[in-house]
């Protein structure tokens, strides 16, 4: 009897260990709630009917170029601050246009490590007015300062929003990628000094053409990424697993366009395992767009 009792006890122990796992396996994986989509808007949507506030939003500060103003900024921020995220205490994000022009007659370019009375600590040394990383760093720092002033001028009190740097070939850039990188580093330095989080919006191709490889010593290296180029909710989801713009970065948002609106998919912080129905954008009325709008839209976030 003793061997039988031992065998019976062993079988009961095995059943106790296997039972719950087997039940879980039969039940299948736990389904995650489908993530909601967000929108980004800016000056091209001025005068247009906006959709109901989405889960989250990103609003453009500029009018398509650095150091310009989105004329509808205040109204669009008011719309964006009705999103689900804003209701939960997270204000809508903003994005700013970026460019490195170099010393040209029609645009301001620095000649020293100062701007509006501020002494700028420059990792590239002294700016002498030339087309160098040192001067690009000061220029970027100054553009970011102006962007913050634009946001404050719109009556916005939530300065500590997430700020995205819009890096696209549609704006002016120099042939030297190191100079272009310094421009973005200067912007990042000023914005992070105000206590905000900064990220980069671009595509792999455009970022490679403008900036190229970024090393661990750059303040761009670990920034979160917002990747453009997806064509649908499904491909936006797939873009979450794409390579980041920098080796130390992470893909946080992906973007696709439908109708006259850009839609954004928020990537999960962990790898996607459970499959669930993808959220779909609400139908939008078709509107005729001019050739000029189409050309600008291809070069800028709308």
Can you say where each PLM-predicted feature lies in the sequence?
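Secretory targeting and sorting signals
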Residues: 1-25
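Functionally critical loop-and-helix segments that line ligand-binding/catalytic clefts
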Residues: 27-52, 217-302
């Amino acid at each position: 009897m003793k061997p039988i009792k031992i065998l019976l006890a062993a079988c009961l122990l095995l059943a106790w260990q296997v039972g719950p796992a087997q039940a879980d396996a039969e039940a299948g994986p736990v389904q995650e709630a489908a993530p909601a989509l967000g929108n980004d808007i800016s000056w091209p949507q001025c005068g247009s009917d906006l959709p109901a506030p989405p889960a989250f939003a990103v609003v453009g500060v500029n009018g398509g170029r650095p150091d310009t103003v989105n004329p509808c900024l205040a109204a669009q921020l008011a719309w964006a601050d009705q999103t689900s995220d804003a209701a939960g205490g997270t204000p809508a994000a903003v994005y700013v246009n970026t460019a490195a022009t170099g010393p040209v007659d029609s645009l301001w370019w620095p000649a020293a490590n100062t701007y509006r009375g501020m002494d700028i600590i420059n990792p590239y040394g002294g700016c002498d007015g030339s087309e160098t990383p040192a001067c690009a760093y000061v220029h970027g720092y100054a553009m970011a300062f102006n962007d913050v002033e634009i946001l404050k001028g719109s009556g916005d009190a939530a300065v500590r929003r997430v700020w995205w740097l819009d890096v696209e070939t549609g704006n002016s850039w120099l042939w030297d990628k190191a100079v272009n990188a310094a421009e973005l580093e200067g912007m990042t330095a000023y914005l992070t000094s105000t206590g905000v989080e900064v990220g980069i919006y671009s595509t792999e191709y455009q970022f490679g053409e403008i900036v190229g490889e970024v090393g661990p010593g750059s303040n761009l290296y670990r920034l979160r990424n917002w990747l453009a180029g997806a064509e649908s909710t499904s491909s936006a989801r797939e873009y979450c697993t794409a390579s980041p713009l920098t080796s130390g970065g992470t893909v946080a948002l992906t973007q696709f366009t439908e109708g006259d609106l850009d839609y954004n998919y928020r990537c999960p912080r962990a790898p996607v395992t459970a499959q669930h129905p993808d959220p779909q954008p609400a139908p939008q009325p078709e509107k005729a767009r001019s050739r000029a709008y189409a050309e600008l839209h291809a070069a800028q976030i709308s």
